[in-house]
Amino acid sequence: MILGTSKADWLVEFPRLADLIALRPSEWFNPAIAPSTEALADVGLGAADVADASARLQRFAPLIARLFPETAASGGIIESDLVEVATFHDALRQHYAAELPGRLWLKRDSHLPISGSIKARGGIYEVLAHAERLALEHGLVGLDDDYSRLAEADCRAFFARHRIAVGSTGNLGLSIGIIGAALGFQASVHMSADARQWKKDKLRAHGVTVVEYASDYSVAVEQGRREAAGDPYTHFVDDENSRDLFLGYAVAAERLRGQLDAAGIRVDSEHPLFVHLPCGVGGGPGGVAFGLKLAFGDAVHCLFAEPTHSPCMFLGVYTGRHEQVSVQDFGIDNRTAADGLAVGRPSGFVGRAMQRLLDGYYTVDDDELFRLLALLERSQGIRLEPSALAGAPGIARVTREPQGYRERMGLTSARLANATHLVWATGGGMVPEAEMRAYLERGRSLLD
């Protein structure tokens, strides 16, 4: 029984569960999507909140440039490149034996400075927001001061009396541990069994305490939350419920708008933008999608991509039960090579906030992630970790879907021909060479 209902009855009410349970790659295009002007109210946050987050990151830019010299060229702003991947697009046409109209671009959060993943957005932002609250409250800086002062010894000594804790499959912990340690905080990262060893090693090299679990992500988060509870000197970064994380990710959208403008890419009803976002617990893709809907309204179509073994957000939103159900409830094992997406229970906050704003959800099996990883490297010379390829099949899923989604959304052949598809590459820039070689060898063996 699952929430008092037999699995057989769940399958009658929600027939797409059969494919999820059988681990078959599948998709579901959301029939409940609503106009963004109406559905954005579900989130409980607005454009002013995102603007406030953007301004905070600007205040911290001098400090980031001082602590991380690799960001000096961008003035301490942590941002990634947007690149067209036309050769990969051609390779996908051959791979899927389909026309795949439109243009294909890659957002390279995989190569963001500091931690090499999308988590350098939300994770670093939340730690900075917490540091600012402490610094303002204790008179270390004023809002108009040069925040690079927070790197001075007295400020570091102050932060050293405070702790930052987080539960993670890897990349969020990497971001929070590195920025926390750089500011002087005591940092502890509770890591699930899925976390890669090199990520644990890197954190320890930065002086971060790594607590390892033999169980999955949800247990690591719960243990981290429990350890932090009741300690006024510990700030727990709650990936399942944090609005600060969400806003840190949302800032990406206005910056993307500037990059699209610079590339001469129009986004409107006749030139739709499809953004394919890998999804774990949901905070990163949810925050980015929220920002995109604020920036582009109904001209942007956001889709979440998950591993077949960890389809937690698909399951939660499709059934309407959100965090009340886990993939394990239905016999899905939550074991995937896409370690950054190995989450069995979704964020209820994100699922409810975004359920009328997202166009759809789809799953990808691990072998396909490795094929696409090798195909991207072969065609464009770009190397990503498996999780980051989850969005790559999206252009084919949209083009070939049989559920009437394109007709419902007014996505005519002419509009699809004018479309821009953006694959959000979430991580991989810091994967050790030996590990990347193993990824590529597996992918090439599956392709050839």
UniProtKB/Swiss-Prot annotation:
Keywords: Lyase, Pyridoxal phosphate
Residues the record lists as N6-(pyridoxal phosphate)lysine modifications: K119
Reactions performed catalytically: D-serine = pyruvate + NH4(+)
Domain of life: Bacteria
Cofactor: pyridoxal 5'-phosphate
GO MF annotation list: D-serine ammonia-lyase activity; hydro-lyase activity; pyridoxal phosphate binding
GO biological process, one term: isoleucine biosynthetic process
Keyword Kinase part of the UniProt annotation: no
SUPFAM superfamilies: Tryptophan synthase beta subunit-like PLP-dependent enzymes
Pfam families membership: PALP
Keyword Zinc appears in the UniProt entry: no
This enzyme's EC code(s): 4.3.1.18
Similarity-based family: Belongs to the serine/threonine dehydratase family. DsdA subfamily.
Protein name: Probable D-serine dehydratase
